[in-house]
């Protein structure tokens, strides 16, 4: 169940990025030292994390590391890439909560909800433990 929620949330954010943030994701790809031919899920998640970083209180380097871990976890499950390490339950759970919060940020921003009201969401379950979740994504 947790894995399905993780995969569905990844897909939602990847689709949003493809439709509405493709240029921003391309800029992340260009700055990636391990450039690929195209924009990958890692670049899309990293772009969204960078956009959300003021609210999340994370650095640019953390955005890259988190995006890499999340992308590897998604690839493990969707491509049955057994060369990768199976993500832990804690990593999947924490990644799911982080991605779900980013999805809320996207939706609330599109609805015109002010940033200070969005920041209030972090005080409520399950988002009050966002710092803990970020630390569990490894």
Residue locations for each model-derived region?
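Amphipathic, oligomerization/interface secondary-structure segments
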Residues: 1-138
């Amino acid at each position: 169940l947790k894995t399905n929620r993780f995969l569905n949330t990844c897909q939602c954010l990847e689709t949003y990025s493809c439709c509405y943030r493709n240029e921003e994701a391309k800029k992340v790809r260009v700055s990636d030292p391990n450039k690929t031919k195209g924009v990958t899920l890692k670049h899309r998640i990293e772009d969204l994390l960078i956009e959300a970083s003021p609210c999340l209180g994370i650095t640019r380097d953390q955005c890259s590391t988190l995006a890499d871990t999340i992308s590897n976890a998604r690839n493990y499950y969707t491509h049955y890439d057994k060369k990768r390490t199976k993500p832990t339950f804690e990593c999947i759970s924490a990644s799911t909560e982080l991605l779900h919060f980013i999805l809320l940020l996207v939706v609330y921003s599109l609805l015109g909800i002010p940033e200070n009201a969005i920041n209030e969401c972090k005080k409520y379950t399950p988002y009050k433990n966002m710092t803990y979740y970020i630390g569990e994504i490894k």
